[in-house]
């Protein structure tokens, strides 16, 4: 007897804007998932800039409640038999291109890809997608003020990617993408991408029932076109490590990126990042966390141009709480609120001399619903 299951789950959040749809046809091996999240934030910023030769300026802004990267999309999986399957995904995201108060004025496709896979042989996909190098960092947090954007590419357009997860705890992959005039957020690049490729691997080892270690390592190289000049290239390296004991997780990321010949042949830019995180789950629903990052961006310019250096010490503390978990979990929904505070202590140098000092403080209160 043929069986076709159709499940529709709905939950209340922001006037019932959130819902989840799952379709599964057992006789055909087809499954369609409606995925996404609604994200809102209220943000307050305070800036103090103190030039060495000039007047100190201060600025304080309280923004209206606005979008914080809301998204929705579909995932499709088709079983082909003998362990093989086909898959596809599309995801749209909102972004603010018109300086509106709400931030919902523009919609673009963040993910759009398809491919084939096998649980023993890996997965091959093509399109606009997150890359394996996005998984290398081990300090990233899923809220707004995470300090771990990182130096490795997190996504690529018109890319082909292969990943393998046939060994327990291990995931390895590689990707390549050719020419693109747009970034992963759909906006035009100031210098068009000539090509990009990268490799990455993560491994999670479970020590016992309470302890585990996860590591990540990756490399990426991209090249960009320049008007009336040769293309310039960037090479990025990253290593991440995280340790979990019961409800406590600590992690560290080390990253470095070198850019050569940007703007002028002979220019060399070196970027370094050291990031740390500590997260403590107080209950199943409540967590507190903190991050620290040291970031350096140094330009060794050709003769006749200024050498520059920027040092940034970043601090962040935050807490998140999942609401109504017992009621929403049966409907495949999650609703959380969070509050975060970030402080940036920046020093700028020109030709070895300090040119300015900047203090940036940001506070965010947010809410997210996942389905």
Indicate residue ranges for each PLM-predicted region.
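Cleavable N-terminal export/targeting peptides
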Residues: 1-29
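Residues that define the transmembrane beta-barrel architecture of outer-membrane proteins
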Residues: 30, 58-70, 107-110, 154-158, ...
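Short coil turns and loop connectors of transmembrane beta-barrels in diderm outer membranes
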Residues: 28-30, 80-82, 120-122, 168, ...
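Detector for outer-membrane/organellar transmembrane beta-barrel domains
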Residues: 194-322, 330
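Outer membrane beta-barrel
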Residues: 22-42, 60-181, 193, 203-206
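Transmembrane beta-strands of outer-membrane beta-barrel proteins
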Residues: 32-40, 82, 86-88, 124, ...
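Outer-membrane beta-barrel "beta-signal"
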Residues: 317-323, 358-371
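Transmembrane beta-strands of outer-membrane beta-barrel pores
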Residues: 40-46, 92-96, 128-132, 176-180, ...
């Amino acid at each position: 007897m043929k069986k076709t299951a159709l499940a529709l789950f709905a939950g209340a959040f922001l006037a019932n804007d959130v819902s989840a749809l799952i379709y599964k046809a057992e006789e055909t091996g087809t499954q369609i998932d409606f995925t996404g999240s609604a994200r809102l934030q209220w943000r307050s910023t305070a800036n103090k800039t103190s030039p060495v030769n000039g007047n100190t300026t201060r600025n304080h802004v309280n923004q209206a409640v606005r979008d914080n990267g809301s998204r929705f999309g579909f995932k499709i999986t088709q079983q082909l038999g003998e362990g093989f399957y086909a898959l596809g995904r599309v995801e749209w995201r909102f972004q603010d291109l018109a300086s509106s108060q709400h931030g919902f004025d523009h919609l673009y496709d963040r993910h759009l890809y398809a491919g084939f896979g096998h649980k023993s042989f890996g997965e091959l996909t093509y399109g606009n997608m997150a890359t394996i190098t996005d998984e290398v960092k081990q300090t990233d947090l899923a809220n707004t003020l995470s300090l771990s954007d990182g130096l490795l590419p997190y996504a690529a357009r018109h890319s082909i990617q292969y990943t393998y997860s046939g060994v327990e705890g291990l995931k390895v992959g590689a990707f390549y993408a050719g020419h693109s005039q747009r970034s992963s957020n759909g906006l035009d690049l100031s210098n068009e991408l000539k090509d990009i490729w990268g490799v990455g691997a993560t491994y999670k080892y479970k020590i016992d029932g309470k302890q585990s270690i996860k590591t990540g390592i990756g490399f990426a190289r991209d090249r960009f076109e320049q008007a009336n000049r040769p293309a310039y290239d960037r090479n990025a390296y990253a290593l991440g490590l995280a340790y979990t004991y019961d409800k406590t997780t600590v992690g560290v990321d080390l990253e470095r990126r070198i850019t050569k010949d940007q703007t002028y042949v002979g220019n060399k830019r070196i970027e370094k990042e050291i990031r740390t995180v500590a997260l403590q789950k107080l209950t199943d629903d409540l967590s507190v966390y903190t991050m620290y990052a040291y970031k350096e961006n140094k330009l060794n310019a050709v003769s006749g141009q200024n050498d520059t250096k920027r040092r940034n010490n970043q601090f962040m503390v935050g807490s998140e709480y999942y609401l109504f978990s017992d009621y929403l979990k049966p409907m495949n929904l999650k609703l959380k609120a969070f509050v975060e505070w970030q402080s940036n202590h920046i020093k700028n140098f020109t030709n070895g001399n300090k040119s300015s000092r900047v203090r940036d403080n940001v506070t965010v209160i947010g809410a997210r619903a996942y389905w």
